[in-house]
Structures are given as C-alpha cells and as structure tokens.
C-alpha cells in the first residue's frame, strides 16, 4: 500500500532472518514523503511482541530478559537479547514500564527561567546541586522543566515524573497550577504557600529586615533598594507602593516588606527608601540599577543600597566603581543569598546567608520520603563583611 501525500505507514510485513536459532522477525516497512517530495524508506520501531514472535517465546519472557533476568536461564536470556539487538529493539519503553509499576523513578524541577539562565545563575546551580545530591542517593533521575516559550504548562501536564519541585514560581504560575490539577506531589521552594503543595523556604521578611536594620544602626537614613522583577512584564524603574504590594513573586515581595518595616520601625519616612526594579537578574542588571539610584542629586542619593540578591549587589558594586564612589567609605552595599562570589567581591559583600543547597536537598527529600524530611523553614543569618560601614557624615 502506498503512502498518502503526507506520509503514512504502509506495505506488507517484511521477513528478516536473524540467524539466531531460526528466529524470524516481521516488521512493518514505512515510507514517508516529505514536504519536498523526497521519499524516505525505513523500518517502524520494533515492538516487544515482534521480538517474542521471532524467538517463539512469550512477551513476558522478553520483558523478563530486561527487567527480571533471574527468571530466565542465562542461555535463553542471551538468545532473546541478541535477537532484539539485531532487530533494533532497544527494550521495553520507559513510559510502559512506569505505567506498569505505577512510578517512573523520576522527579521533576519546574524552573521559572530558561535552562541557560538556570545553569549560569549561582543560586540556582547551588539549589540544583542539592536536589541532585538527594535524587542520586535515592537512585532517582531528574527532569528539568524550563519556563521557555510558554510551554512549561504543557511539559508539566505531560511529564512522566513521580513528583515536582517548583523553584521560585510566581503566585499564579500556570505550570504549577497544572501540577496541582494532576494531583502530582509537589514541593514549592521560594514561592507561595499553596493548598495541595508542600513547601521549603526561609523567613524572607525577617532576614531582609535584619539586613536593613544593620545599615540603619550604622547610621544610614537614606536607603536604596534594588530588586529583581516583581511582575513578569519587563518593567524597569522606580517602584511605587501599589506595585510592591501586588508583586507576583513572593520572595521579593517579602524582602521588600522586610526592608520597609525595618525602616518604619526606626522612624524613617517612606521616602527614605527608594526601590528600583530590574526585569533581569545579572551583574549587568545590578549595575544598571546602581547607576539609576546613584546618579541623582546629593540630597536624594542613598548612602546605602540593599539588593534583593547577591548577583544584583555585585552589579551595584560595579556601578559604584564606575561612578568613582568608594565602598564602604562613600556607599555601603548589602546583598542576599551568600553565594560564593560574595565573599570574593571587592570589597567582600555583607549579605544574608541561606543554604540554597540544603533547601534543594530537602525539597527532594520531602518527595522521596514524605513526612520524614527536615523542617520546612530554613535558617538565615546576617554575615557582615567589608562592604558596609557608617556613612561619611556619621560621627
């Protein structure tokens, strides 16, 4: 039977002599006519049933040759595997095995960025390192699901995983919602507390307040804040209170709230804390924000800048150098995360320490051994280094 215009399976069975004890294979040929009219011929994927027929054994025998070798004699197993190899059969499909066992032995990680970002961002790399440490110890595989080209929701819906870790999702992330609709065991890291999902996090508000309090106690009364995106709309610029309050990323909403509450508790007016938002998360983004906050008249210029991540804080340090401002003599800078680069910065960066590695490890453990993993709330601590000091006018 010939194929149609767009290519169809067709033709009668073709007999293949494998030379293995008289085994015979019957595989369907297919022909495909591509868009340019070029016809391609090949063999459809060999099935377990065809291998069984070739060897004159049951399908269960072929399946056992792969998954339960102790059920067969060594000679029979070798004959089945050799025949399968010659026929081009690669073994039972992973999807089929997972369906039969009721599990895939795979955990998924839902990322809020594309994969190139995930592999280049120090905090995400540390988090994934912790996840893989736990999955490797448990003999599980890992599937990364990136938020690229708007396809994450479909990928989550179709993913053959036993559980999902959602890393810093937005409050209304559609991919996270898809996982919960599937009733997929889910742990959220750095995101909203959500019905139907477990969580692993830190007290972002209290930790940020501690960093702001440190600067205020040094004598800083004019603060700048650099934050990563609050909404996925690409906005760059100064942030008003309404935009802060409606932020869709819980981590940064809470960190801003901590900075502001510490300032208010010290009697500083709202105007004393100027917030600048960057849609991207890189040293270059932090540098751009630093230029925006520092290139203003003296009476508006902050004497200290709080960055919601260390990556952005490193950019602020770069901006200060480019503007000829000495840190900490002219400007104090504090970050958040305590990535490895923060201790090597010039000067070394004051920051809030959190173990992203441990959080990643515990997210995976909560899925691997539900109910026996460590506490959901992880500790933080302020690490004071050489990037913060009293302001120039402080006695």
What are these regions (language model features)?
Residues 8-10, 21, 287, 291-395:
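Flexible loop/turn connectors
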Residues 58, 105, 162, 220-222, ...:
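Short acidic/polar active-site loop segments enriched in Thr and Asp
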Residues 78, 82, 90-155, 163:
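Amphipathic helical "hinge" segments at domain boundaries
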Residues 114-125, 147-151, 200-207, 225-264, ...:
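Hinge/beta->alpha junction and helix N-cap segments in small-molecule ligand-binding domains
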Residues 170-206, 228-237, 337-349:
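Flexible loop/hinge segments that line or gate small-molecule binding clefts
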